[in-house]
């Protein structure tokens, strides 16, 4: 698993919180102090908490669990998509649709519609559709793909969710709380850690910091998958030897 160091966190600006006037007192225990009216996050707390989050992800995935990556703010979108894809995990990078988890049956129907429209589009020219009709079909598919493309291969509700910016993803946390799905989240000094099982106190605005978190969690996923594979191979070899 990638060992993130204190130096890497400092270089990525993980320690820079929000302006002191916007702080959430519930984050006081993770704040080292303030500089130029900006809160400084205590990285001596962040680093071990991030490692705990990585270990939790590794264990969960080693047991065949699924982690949903969520980050829909502008500076997180591309990174969330890239790292979740690298790890082979589902993601939401465009917009959190209300009921994405609590009304999952309806979401599954929308995913089915996306699959049907995609299949129809592939054969549209042969089926005699006009250029205008094909263009409309493309727009429909692109719209659905933007919202649902990252979760279209998800087999059911995720076992955990990894979130960038709990303030931005309030709707996500409401749904995870209702369903009892554990949350791993980056929580900045202006947000509340309530409802988050694995809190990662730190900067949730810097693309460098977001990349560091996402890469670390994706690496933990890949290590968990590798462990699961090794255990499967060992079990098969043991069975063959009997």
UniProtKB/Swiss-Prot annotation:
Keyword Ligase: no
Pfam families tied to this protein: Ribosomal_S2 (PF00318)
UniProt keyword Ribosomal protein present: yes
Keyword terms of this UniProt record: Ribonucleoprotein, Ribosomal protein
GO cellular component term, pick one: cytosolic small ribosomal subunit
Protein origin, superkingdom: Bacteria
Cited InterPro entries: Ribosomal_uS2 (IPR001865), Ribosomal_uS2_bac/mit/plastid (IPR005706), Ribosomal_uS2_CS (IPR018130), Ribosomal_uS2_flav_dom_sf (IPR023591)
GO biological process per UniProt: translation
Alphabetized GO MF terms: structural constituent of ribosome
Protein family (similarity comment): Belongs to the universal ribosomal protein uS2 family.
Record-given protein name: Small ribosomal subunit protein uS2
């Amino acid at each position: 698993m990638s060992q993130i160091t204190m130096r890497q966190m400092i270089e990525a600006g993980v320690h820079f919180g929000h302006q002191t006037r916007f702080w959430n007192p519930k984050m006081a225990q993770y704040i080292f102090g303030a500089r130029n009216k900006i809160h400084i996050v205590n990285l001596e707390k962040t680093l071990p908490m991030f490692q705990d989050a990585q270990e939790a992800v590794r264990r969960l995935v080693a047991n065949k669990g699924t982690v949903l990556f969520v980050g829909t703010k502008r500076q997180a979108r591309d990174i969330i998509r890239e790292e979740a894809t690298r790890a082979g995990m589902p993601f939401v990078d465009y917009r959190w649709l209300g009921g994405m988890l609590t009304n999952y049956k309806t979401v599954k129907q929308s995913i089915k519609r996306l699959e049907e429209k995609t299949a129809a589009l592939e054969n549209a020219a042969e089926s005699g559709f006009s250029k205008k009709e094909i263009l409309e079909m493309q727009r429909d598919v692109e719209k659905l793909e933007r919202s649902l493309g990252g979760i279209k291969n998800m087999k059911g509700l995720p076992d955990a969710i990894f979130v960038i910016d709990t303030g931005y993803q309030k709707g996500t946390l409401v749904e995870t709380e209702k369903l009892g799905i554990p949350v791993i989240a980056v929580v900045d000094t202006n947000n509340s850690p309530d409802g988050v099982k694995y809190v990662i106190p730190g900067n949730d605005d810097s693309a460098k910091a977001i990349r560091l978190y996402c890469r670390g969690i994706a690496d933990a996923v890949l290590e968990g998958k590798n462990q699961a594979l090794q255990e499967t191979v060992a079990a098969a070899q043991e069975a063959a030897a009997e």
